[in-house]
Amino acid sequence: MKVKIKCWNGVATWLWVANDENCGICRMAFNGCCPDCKVPGDDCPLVWGQCSHCFHMHCILKWLNAQQVQQHCPMCRQEWKFKE
Amino acid sequence: MAAAAVRDGDPGPTQELLVAWNTVSTGLVPPAALGLVRPRKRAAGPRGVPGIRPWGSLGSPGSPSLASPAASPPLHPFPTCPRLSAPFPSPLCVPSLRSSALQASSRTSGAVPPKEEELRAAVEVLRGHGLHSVLEEWFVEVLQNDLQANISLEFWNAISQHENYADEPQCLLLLLDAFGLLESRLDPYLHSLELLEKWTRLGLLMGAGAQGLREKVHTTLRGVLFFSTPRTFQEMIQRLYGRFLRVYMQSKRKGEGGTDPELEGELDSRYARRRYYRLLQSPLCAGCGSDKQQCWCRQALEQFHQLSQVLHRLSLLERVSAEAVTTTLHQVTRERMEDRCRGEYERSFLREFHKWIERVVGWLGKVFLQDGPARPASPEAGSTLRRWRCHVQRWFYGIYAGLRIEELFSIVRDFPDSRPAIEDLKYCLERTDQRQQLLLSLKAALETRLLHPGVNTCDIITLYISAIKALRVLDPSMVILEVACEPIRRYLRTREDTVRQIVAGLTGDSDGTGDLAVELSKTDPASLETGQDSEDDSGEPEDWVPDPVDADPGKSSSRRRSSDIISLLVSIYGSKDLFINEYRSLLADRLLHQFSFSPEREIRNVELLKLRFGEAPMHFCEVMLKDMADSRRINANIREEDEKRPAEEQPPFGVYAVILSSEFWPPFKDEKLEVPEDIREALEVYCRKYEKLKAMRTLSWKHTLGLVTMDVELADRTLSVAVTPVQAVVLLYFQDQASWTLEELSKVVKMPVALLRRRMSVWLQQGVLREEPAGTFSVVEEERPQDRDSMVLIDSDEESDSGGGGVAARRVVPDLTGLCPQLFWTYIQAMLTNLESLSLERIYSMLRMFVVTGPALAEIDLQELQGFLQKKVRDQQLVYAAGVYRLPKSCS
C-alpha cells in the first residue's frame, strides 16, 4: 500500500513564545489582547524587556507613560529597556 | 233611542237592559260562541267541523254549514262570568224576556248582523246602567272560550291533515287554508274589536285604552292557539320558510335578466364558476327544488305573500314565523358558510356576505310585509327590519368567526396567503365576544397538531414564525400571540436543537426557516440591547388603544407591541448569550469543517447580528472571521515563498493551515497524536515559515481538525479520499508495516485504544483495512469477493457526489464530510436490519447516540442525513414509504 498525500489542510492555533500565559499588567491572556484592543496578534503585539519579562505592548506603554521619574519593569522593578 | 227610553223612566228598565245586552252580545260575537255555554258536548263539536276546503269556499259566519250551532238561538247572553251572573239572572229564568231576546237574536242569526248604530244605542243603554265597564272583559272571555272550545281545535284539526301531504306545494296550500279558516272564524271578533275600540275612543266605554284591549285579544289568541304546538307544525313551518327563502333568492336572481348578480361578481373564482354551471345544468329548479317544467316558484311566492298577509291580519306573523325564520336563516347561513368558506383562506368573504345579508333582509321585508311601495315604511316597521338585519349580521359574524377559529391553525400555517381570512376574523372578532374561544381553540390545536415528538423542531419554529406574523395582524397588541403561543415557547425550550435551528435559520443555513434570514436583514431592527421601556413615547395620543383585558399587566404594552420575530424567538430562552454562543460554535463548525464557506456572507451575517445583539457579544465572531482572512493571506505568502525555491526544495505536498486565535474560538478537543516523521517535518517547515513571518509566535497544530486529501494506492485499486489528519496519520503507519495490533499502534500513535479503534473504523469501512483476528489490523491489498459489496457502495456514492446533480449531492459536500456518510451507512443498515423500519428523526437520533467518531461526523445535521438517505433511495439501496425508511427485500 502506498499513501500519497496530495494536500494537507491543517488547523493550528498561534501563540506567543513567552514564558507566561497572561500579561502581568492587564492579566489578560497573551494570546488574547489587551483590554483596549479588539483584535489579537499583529494589532496587539507583545514586547519583551531586557529583564525577559513581556507584556502587551499597549499595557507596558501605558505603564511607562504613567511613570514619572524612572521607568521600571512592573514585575521586577529593574529599569525597563526594550529588548532588541 | 234606547238610552232615551231609560232616561224617560221607561217602565221596563230590566227588560230594556236585557234587550240591549242581547243586542250587544249577539252583535259583537258570533252566535256560535254564545251557544257555547250550553251542554258541554259541544266540546266534541269541532271534530265534526268539515275538514279542509279549497281556499275561498270557506264558510262565513252566516253560511249554512256554520249556522248549525246558531240554529238554536243563544239563550244565555251572559256566559261564564260569575260577576255578571248575580245581578243578571239568567234570561232563561225570565220568561218575559225570552221573546225579545229571541227576537234580538233571531235578527242577528240571519245573515245581517246588527247595524253599528243599533249596537251603539244598545251600548248607550248598558252605559246608562253602568254595565259598559264589563263589556270588554266579557268580550275577551267569550273569545277565549270560543277559541278553547272550537276555533283552536278546528284549526289544529285542519293542520293535522298535513301528515297526509308529503310535498311542499300541498303543505303550503294546507297551511294557507288552515289560517284562512282561522281568519274567517276570528273575523267577527276582529270586527267587533274595531267597534269596541271605536267606542272606547268615543268615550262610551271605559277601556284600558284601546291598545290595551287589542293587545289582550291578541295575547289571548296567541296563548290559546299555540298553547301546545305540535313539533310537526313547527317543522312544517320551518321547512316552508326555508323553501320560501330559496324561492325568493332564486327569483331575485332570475329577476335580473337571467344573470346571477351574486355569482357574476365572483365568477373569477373557479369554485364559483363550477357551481354556477352546475346550477345551469341541473334539471331541478334551484328555487323550489322541483323539476324545471313544474316549477312552482311563482305560485309559491304569491301564496307566501297571502299567508303573510293572513298572519299579519291575525297578528300572528311574529309568533308563527319568527322562530322558523330565525332557524332558517341560521341554517342557510351556516350551510352557505360551510359551502363556500371552509378551507378557503385566500380571499375575504365579508363583502360577499354583506351583500348576501342585504338580500336576505330583502326577503325578511317580504316575510314581514314591510317592503313594496304600497306600504310606506313606518318607523316601527323600519326598526323591526333593522333589528333583523342586526340579528342576521351578528349571527353571521358569530359563526364565521367560529369557523375561522376552528381553522385557525391551518390559517396560521398558510399565513402570508391566508391574510384575507385573518383580516375577516379580526373584523368579526371585534363584533363578537369570542376571544376566549379563540385562545382555547388555538392552544388546543397547537397541542394536538404541533407540539409532539413527531414534528421537526424546524417546522415548529416555522409555524411559530407564521403565528407571530399572522397573529400580529389579528391583534396588534400581540396579546393573543403571547397567550396562545406560550405552549410553543415552553415546548421549544425542551427541544435541544431549538437554538441551533434558530441560529441556522438566522444565517440562512436551513431551508425551513429561511424567513428568519430575511427578517434579520430588515432595516431598523428592534435592538435586543435596549428594550424600549418608556411607556408612551411613540405614536399619537389619539391613536392609543388600551390593551385587551387578558393582557399580562406585568409586561409593558409598547414592548409587547414592538417585539419582532427575532426578538421573540431569541427570548424563548430568556437570554441572548445562549444564542450567541450557539452562533459562535456554529460559525466555528462552518469555518473549520466546510472549507468552502463564503466569507462575504459570513461577514454580512455577523454585521446584521451585531445590529441586534450589540457590538460586544459579536466581537468574538468578528475575530474568527478575521482569522480566516489572515490565514488565507499567510498561506498565500508562504506559498509564494515556496515557489521561489528550486524544485528539490519544494515540499512533497502542499501544507495549508487555518490559523486561529485560540482565545476567541470555542474550545477544541485536544487529541494527542504522534505524526509520522515526514509529515511532522512538513508541518514543522510550515511552522518555521510562519515563525519567520510573525516574530515571536509559533503554531500548535490541532490534528482533530482539518482535511487531508490523498490517494491510497493498493494492489488492485486506488482510492482517492479526503479524511481528517488523524485518519490520514493512522493509515500512514500502515505504509511501512502492513499489519498492526491495536495496542502496538496505540503506543506508536499515542492515542488511547478506544479512540484509535473508532478512528480506524473509517478504513475498515472503506475496505482498506480489515480486522483479522480481533485486535489485529492489516491492509487489504486485494479485495476479496465478500468485500466487494461495500466497495460498490462507495463507488456509487462518490460518483453521485462528484456528479453534483441532486439536492443530496449538493448538500453532502464530498470533500468535507468525506467518508462520514459512508460510515453512517453501516450503522443505518444495522439499525434497519434490526428494527425493520425507522423514520428520519429516529435514525438521526440513534446515530447521534451511537456514532461519536469525531467532530467531523457529529457535524452532519438532519438535512444532510436526509439528503444522504434520499440518495440511497435513489440508488435503490433503501426504500422510503409512509415516512419511514426500510431496506429493500433483496438487500437484507
Swiss-Prot record, chain A:
Coiled coil: none annotated. A zinc finger (RING-type) spans 34-77. Zn(2+) 2 binds at residues 51, 53, 73, 76. It is found in: Cytoplasm; Nucleus. Pathway: Protein modification; protein ubiquitination. Auto-ubiquitinated. Zn(2+) 1 binds at residues 23, 26, 56, 59. GO terms for molecular function: cullin family protein binding; G protein-coupled receptor binding; ubiquitin protein ligase activity; ubiquitin-ubiquitin ligase activity; zinc ion binding. GO terms for cellular component: anaphase-promoting complex; cytoplasm; nucleolus; nucleoplasm. It comes from the Eukaryota. Pfam families: zf-ANAPC11. The keyword Cell division applies. The mammalian APC/C is composed at least of 14 distinct subunits ANAPC1, ANAPC2, CDC27/APC3, ANAPC4, ANAPC5, CDC16/APC6, ANAPC7, CDC23/APC8, ANAPC10, ANAPC11, CDC26/APC12, ANAPC13, ANAPC15 and ANAPC16 that assemble into a complex of at least 19 chains with a combined molecular mass of around 1.2 MDa; APC/C interacts with FZR1 and FBXO5. Interacts with the cullin domain of ANAPC2. Interacts with UBE2D2. Belongs to the RING-box family. This is Anaphase-promoting complex subunit 11. It comes from Mus musculus.
